Amino acid sequence: MYYYLHELKEYDIRIIGLDLKKEVIRHCNELSEKYGYEKLRFLEGDIADYTGVNKVDMVVTLHACDTATDYALAKAVGWDAKVILSVPCCQHELNRQIRNEVLEPVLRYGLLKERMAALITDGLRAQYLEREGYEAQILELSLIHI
């Protein structure tokens, strides 16, 4: 993303990446230094607690697990981000809570329950963004077509 926006499109950008895994952060910072990306840095930390900026133009979440996606979306809205791109990961929070007597014949199958929880969670996230004034789309990124 940095390469595309900074090198190809020639935007004057700064990108901060967050992750909880120290090894991931170390590796990403090594790559940033290797390629001379001076305004690309990675920090170990939780998006829910991050206070390093007051305003951003774009927020991207990539496989932010469980409620980390929700915290990132709330931060993006709070920062009044112009663009939000979110690729959520697992949705364990709703998966643990979803119970419905009528749907029990379907929900008893773990895979179907997991997918239903993911769809409902993504729908609720899209509605939250729309309620906050954003246009929202839900798309599926499938590796089958790549």
Q: How would you name each of these model-derived features?
A:
Residues M1-E10:
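Conserved SAM-binding loop of SAM-dependent methyltransferases across substrates and taxa
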Residues R14-D19:
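Conserved SAM-binding motif I beta-strand of class I
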Residues H27-N54:
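S-adenosyl-L-methionine
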Residues T67-K75:
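A short, conserved alpha-helix within the catalytic core of class I
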Residues K82-L94:
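Conserved beta-strand signature within the Rossmann-like core of class I S-adenosyl-L-methionine
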Residues L119-E132:
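Short alpha-helix
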Residues E135-S142:
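Conserved S-adenosyl-L-methionine
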